[in-house]
């Protein structure tokens, strides 16, 4: 395994801005697909996350008509940097996104979405085109939001998606945060568990070379390593690509029910001992990965392992 503390070239997620500028690419959020939002909420609240109210998602009609139902709805756990999203199909809907979500749940419950944020959505669209991803038309996603003073507002995102077969690992997308100040409101950011930032995600795949190369073309960022574990460092955040054997080395006890599999999300704690104490008092067990990183089992985190690391460690590690 790499000497994680020697990874000084990597900027800790909590030290980076909330949204990128120029050609920078950040890991914006990751998403769970779930069949039961109530059960999910109980699980995540036990881990110390505050969840936003459930909202059915809508796309803006390009012809100026009423909003178009996306077929899915979400709740979010906002962090000081990045966030976690939890999605379920809206009952009675039949849309491409609801069908994709239900098909993914047939494979496994857990992480199925990774979203990168950019500043230049038009430039990112052209990059996806030139990379051979045949991106779909940009989606102007809107959802209502209640502000801290009780007034209503609307948050906006420009989302770039590609046909599902282009990125079979899950719903992999680019987006521009049009209203970041509304998305990251201070009163909805949980602090009791000490977790402050989204650091990365670990994917278990059959062909590490092919998948890492494809994600490199998708993001425009380079790959480290050439074996059965490789990594891709963004301007904020990192992805790790592991074979089944590499997953067993890095995350003992975590097994992929199928491949491809988004195995773990990595979260930075501002004070690991505080996080560990909070989880222990909540009845959630953790196992040590190092002196500066702990693991929450998928059983306790709605199907995905959660790695919590502090400022002296970096997860996923650089290959």
Q: Which stretches of residues belong to each language-model region?
A:
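Membrane-anchoring hydrophobic segments
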Residues: 57-60, 69
